[in-house]
Amino acid sequence: NRNFLRF
């Protein structure tokens, strides 16, 4: 995902 550890 876009909000998971900068990804």
From Swiss-Prot:
Gene Ontology biological process terms in this record: neuropeptide signaling pathway
Species this chain originates from: Procambarus clarkii
Phenylalanine amide found at: F7
Signal peptide positions on this chain: none
UniProt KW Secreted keyword: yes
Biological function: Increases the rate and amplitude of spontaneous contractions of semi-isolated hearts. Increases the amplitude of excitatory postsynaptic potentials in abdominal extensor muscle.
Compartmental location: Secreted
Transmembrane helix in keyword set: no
One GO term describing the cellular component: extracellular region
Similarity remark: Belongs to the FARP (FMRFamide related peptide) family.
UniProt keyword terms in alphabetical order: Amidation, Neuropeptide, Secreted
The protein, known as: Cardio-excitatory FMRFamide homolog NF1
